[in-house]
């Protein structure tokens, strides 16, 4: 049975035709898989996996990987047993994942994990801003000849504001992933080993190379206590990946649904009294109000979590 048919039969995988493409299907794990922790060879692979009707992989994202402590496999004890040193540690940029791959006609796929979405426009926008025509030809040739997807983190604060502040649009190259069913990074994702010709695209900021358990513990502590970063992404010598998010980032993000519900009028402050973050939420609400911004992508007024993060960093 083809992988596409196996994905179609799996109740924990969504398979949807990609808008604007012929015979191309986006495979992603379902909300239930995420909610109940149903992780197996199909659900972990179905995270931005794009298959044609003949079972060819045309675009591919990362396999699902987890935060430290998110499950038994990523407890610190399990990680210490499993990893192979050295481990490369990169800054986890706070944007959204873009997947760029070569079409046969000299053009590109610009996909999010779901395929052609409204955010695909932003991927293409930032890509075109950061590259010249010669750069794009170099990138297309490399992706086509290597049969690879370039996974990127897209930063576009005017249209897609997150928690960590950025002053301008950026695009960080995270990895070159082989377009095949088995996950394989085909090039060093954190430094430019492919020569010049990538315009103003940046490679993900590799800030630590870790050689033993003691160093790993120290870097984890640095990441957890960071006041300015979302967190870190780790990749060991066998391409086993895991991540962490800073305590401040997690605290900020946890309040986002509540703040947006209060802004929309669906709920009141006191509706969140049973939440662990209520004391902080109440203090921000009574002292500063809920900061807002106009989301140019969704066309809605939303809680400005960058401002909330700044309040927490400096006042609470």
Kindly give the residue locations of the regions a language model identified.
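Core nucleotide-handling region used for phosphoryl-transfer chemistry
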Residues: 1-316
């Amino acid at each position: 049975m083809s992988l596409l048919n196996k994905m179609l039969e799996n109740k924990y995988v969504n398979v949807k035709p990609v808008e604007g493409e012929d015979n191309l299907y986006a495979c992603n794990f379902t909300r239930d898989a995420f909610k109940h922790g149903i992780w197996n060879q199909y659900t972990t692979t179905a995270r931005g996996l794009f298959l044609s009707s003949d079972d060819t992989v045309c675009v591919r994202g990362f396999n699902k990987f987890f935060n430290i402590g998110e499950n038994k496999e990523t407890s610190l004890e399990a990680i210490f047993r499993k990893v192979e040193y050295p481990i490369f540690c990169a800054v986890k940029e706070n944007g959204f994942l873009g997947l760029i791959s070569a079409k046969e006609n000299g053009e590109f796929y610009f996909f999010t994990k779901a395929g052609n979405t409204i955010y695909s426009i932003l991927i293409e926008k930032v890509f075109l801003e950061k590259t010249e025509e010669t750069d794009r030809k170099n990138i297309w040739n490399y992706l086509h000849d290597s049969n690879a997807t370039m996974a990127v983190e897209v930063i576009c604060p005017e249209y897609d504001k997150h928690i960590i502040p950025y002053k301008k649009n950026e695009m960080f190259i995270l990895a070159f992933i082989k377009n095949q069913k088995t996950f394989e990074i085909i090039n060093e994702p954190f430094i430019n080993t492919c020569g010049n010709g990538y315009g103003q695209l940046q490679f993900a900021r590799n800030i630590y190379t870790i050689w033993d358990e003691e160093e790993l513990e120290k870097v984890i502590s640095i990441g957890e206590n960071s006041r300015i970063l979302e967190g870190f992404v780790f990749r060991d010598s066998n391409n086993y990946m895991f991540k962490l998010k800073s305590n401040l980032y997690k605290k900020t993000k946890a309040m986002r649904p509540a703040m947006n519900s209060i802004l929309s009028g669906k709920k009141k402050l006191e509706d969140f009294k049973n939440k662990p973050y209520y004391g902080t939420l109440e203090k921000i609400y009574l002292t500063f109000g809920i900061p807002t911004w106009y989301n140019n992508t969704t066309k809605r007024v939303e809680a400005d979590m960058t401002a909330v993060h700044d309040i927490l960093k400096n006042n609470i």
